[in-house]
């Protein structure tokens, strides 16, 4: 019984669910000198003098650097984290500077577990490792060597963390959106939106009594029922030139703010959406796109994979390990943005490898024989072309050297190998960054069964539907776990924490994430034609 009480107490300390005192009186101007000092210390571990903060752990072990950054453990939201049995408590100002009280059914006041922190008690906690009750903090909590000015800055900064619910949340409803393009086929957009509509309809029907429970929740179940909100998903359809998309997104957002953007189908041009998401601090979660933005500066966009770049990185990795004996020729389409991105990525990844790399566009190949350029390198030829263009080149009368290896990206070509001649097929390997099609039925059995039950299954768009369903499930579970703390940063942190343990992985054999990672799948197969018009894996699932 004592162990159960200790576990419940730890959960309360972490989540801060039962805090009943008045709001903190510390109002901070974002951008003030104190705020700037505190932000540098909290997010980078940098003191006002520009030096890295220093501390000790376990009594006398000196440490410094990244491991002392407050944000690493307490996170961007200030809402804390867990790792195994280790609980890092929430330190956002509206929790830290209030008493922590345990729930009770007996008025007038619940018992105080921990008094509100003051400047003095917080200094004791940070410097000496003593909490507001005078008890020792966890030995893993660093004992920092900071001065009063740094503490004032830290107090100012944490007072700005997770203060009010993020936009898109009302007392009754939580608003989301999904993004599609008018240039997508009607079938593709409809397949995605059918999943969104069916999921939200079922979710709201299944929880139709939750509104009453939220209004009249018993004291010991308030944590469960009070956070309930109905879901509403808005469709943001982008039209016309990419340069106008951000303006269109701003107009949609001004009309109805959303808590997060879920999935969406934007094959190319996602950079415009990403810039909008970052500018407005909106989580944009698991879009289906071949051109995600790959930048350490981006925080709010989380992707399924790295798109065309991932297959180019996979090609580079495989060439270095298995095909480094010869040179590499890349064949690309100068009119195709994806083709150019993949081309440049492979060039960059092989730049210092000692492997000779040449490139030829389709325009150049009209004047040069495919065989003549293949004999120059005696190694590997990589095609960044769609199926029609690739087949036209490979199925010409040109005889290619038997020693030549041909790598084809399945994102460009697809997985239908009926048109690849058998004699050439022996030399062809496919770069494939999702599950092999023959194994997808097993992997997608849960989502496909649900689509069929809802009468929305579209075999032609099953990957689009599977990704949409995955994104909805992840967001649904994450919203449940934030338990009424509707802060966007906290939502992202929950997603980062739970991805590894999900039973459903969409079209990928495995997914994983860690704090500040933004791509759930980073692996690939090398595959070959199976002789039946499809592909089969040639290697195990690998990481670049």
Predicted regions and their residues:
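Hydrophobic h-region of N-terminal signal peptides that target proteins for export
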Residues: 12-22
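Detector for the c-type heme attachment site
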Residues: 43-46, 72-79, 96, 127-131, ...
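Extracytosolic ligand-binding ectodomains
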Residues: 159-544
